[in-house]
Every structure is written in structure tokens, then in C-alpha cells.
Amino acid sequence: MASEYEKMIAGDYYRPADPELRALAQASREKQEAFNQEVDPKKGAAIIKEWFGSTGENLYLNRQVLVDYGGNIHIGENFYANYNLTMLDVCPITIGKNAMIGPNCQFLTPLHPLDPDERNSGLEYGAPITIGDNFWAGGGVTILPGVTLGDNVVAGAGAVVTKSFGDNVVLAGNPARVIKEIPVKKEKR
């Protein structure tokens, strides 16, 4: 039988009050507290590398970083996040290389049942977020559960991304929609 953690990261119904999950969340809160009090960027990066599931080199995250578990977050090389990053990682959050995240951005994988009886039972579920390389999120962007974004995507300030999009697009609005395609540069000969 699958553990509540295994159910959670698979996107199945799980019980967030499970003792194992509570212990993992508490360990994450301790790392969160240490990171958010650290003023030395190198020491902060070391905490992130220990806390998150995987990271590339050259990462910089401003304070306040808020996450559920940390171990389900995977970020690539050259990752920058401005102030107040929230990553609720009940399912994996994967972001490719060369990402720039503006202030007050949220990556949210948790979902709750719509049926009130199911919701009141304490069950939750989630869906992963996957983002390709060269992502730029303006301030206040929210990425919702189950979203996949391709490479070279720009999400304009305040965008609420509720569905998946492919490569080379600029998104804006609530719900986010494509407002511009980014031309692909031709190879130089």
C-alpha cells in the first residue's frame, strides 16, 4: 500500500495530517526559517541546495521563500527569484535553466475537492507544475496546478496561468492567454 507521501506526489488523494507528512513539513519549515533569516547569499544558496530536491549552479533567491516540503522542487542552472516566492510543492515543481522570477510569484500544486463532503473529509490532491528553459515571470504571477509551460515563455505581471502553453509565447491576464508569440531566431551561418 502506498504511503501518504507517495499518494501526494503522484497526485492521488492523500491526508495532509499524516504524521510522516507533518514531520516533513516541519523539517521544511526549519529550513525555511533558516533561509529567510540568512543575509549571506552564499549561505542562503547552500540552504536551498540542501532543502530543494535538486538545483543547478548559480542560483539566487531573495527572502521570503515559502514552500510546503522543498524536496519536490527542482530548479535548473541560473535561477533567480525576487522577494516573496511561494512554491507549494505537494506535487513536483520543475523549472528549467535560466529562469527569472519576479516578486510575489506563486507556484501552487495543491488542489482540494469541489464536493463539500469530500473537501470536509480532509482529503487533498495535487498536480505537478513543469516549466521549460528561459522562463521569465513578472511580478505577481500565479502558476496553478497541472500547468506545463514550454521553453522561452514570458508571463506578464499579474498573470494567472490556469492551463498549459507551448514554447515562445508571452502570456498575460487572468486567466492568462497568449498576447504575443516570440520570434525564433534563425541560426547564423
Predicted regions and their residues:
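Terminal amphipathic alpha-helical/low-complexity segments used for targeting or macromolecular assembly
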Residues: 1-58, 175-189
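Short, solvent-exposed loop/turn elements at beta->coil junctions and helix N-caps
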Residues: 48-49, 64-66
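Short-chain dehydrogenase/reductase
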Residues: 60, 136, 154, 170-172
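Flexible, glycine/small-residue-enriched loop-and-beta-strand segment within the central core
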Residues: 65-75, 80-149, 174-189
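C-terminal/domain-terminus segments
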Residues: 151-164
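Acidic, glycine-centered active-site loop in nucleotide-sugar glycosyltransferases
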Residues: 165-167, 172-175
